[in-house]
Amino acid sequence: MIVKSRYVLAGIALLYSSVAAAGITLGGTRIIYPQKSKETSILVKNDGNQDIMIQSWIEPDVAFKGKDVPFALTPALSRLATGKQQTLRVFYYGQGLPGDKESVFWLNVQEIPQKAEGDNTLQLAIRQRIKVFYRPDAMTGSSAEAASGLKWRVQDESGKRYLRVTNDSLYHVSFGTTQYKSDGKTYPVDTEMVSPLSTGKFPVKGAPVGSIDKRSVVEYYNINDYGAPIKHTVSVFE
């Protein structure tokens, strides 16, 4: 059994030593699509050492699951030579989305190597995924104000501590690192994007339940329109 295990491990090491190098770079970490724009776009570059095929598509977030995607994307399938770049163009059909708040979708870009360099080469189809935010002209406020205006509260439930966050804005808020600081200790918080006019509940890892230090704060980073993390520190009692 020990001998067999050694052969298996050796085989795995040999296989991964021959993985084909490939990689695409997107020209941004998100796409902002204002209603007044006829289209929006993003650059895709092949930084790998071989030519690849690129397949791209847009899919809905949870709020639009099961519904038609009101966007067109071109080119949906194309060849991209090593070191070259191309533009992906996104078009909104003009109907199907709320006119008073932001909507979010996902742009998927998948690279498919065209041919193997040898019989023992492992070919990988790697997918990148970024958010597409559609913003109607009728929206008020800004994404920056949305991020800074979040309301945080502590909630203990079933023997665990949570942070409840309320987003009263018309924008989505995406998070980077979030921490809960209480009684001189720091606890990580598992956060995810909060939709417009909604509330999220996030677990605080390792935090005790019961009494709440009135000096407790939440330190969080939101990801702005340019993909940069912006730091905020707020009290959970305000």
At which residue positions do the language-model features occur?
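Beta-sheet-dominated interaction scaffolds and their linkers
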Residues: 22-45, 142-157
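Terminal connector regions
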Residues: 95-139, 209-238
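Asparagine-centered strand-capping/turn motif at beta-strand->loop junctions
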Residues: 44-48, 163-169
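Intrinsically disordered, low-complexity Pro/Gly/Ser/Thr-rich segments with frequent PxxP/GP/PP motifs
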Residues: 69-97, 184-211
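Surface-exposed binding patches on compact interaction domains or structured appendages
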Residues: 25, 43-91, 176, 182-183
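N-terminal signal peptide c-region/cleavage motif recognized by signal peptidases
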Residues: 17-19
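Short, solvent-exposed loop/turn segments enriched in Ser/Thr/Gly
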Residues: 35-41, 100-105, 159-161, 216
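Bacterial N-terminal signal peptides that target proteins for export
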Residues: 1-11
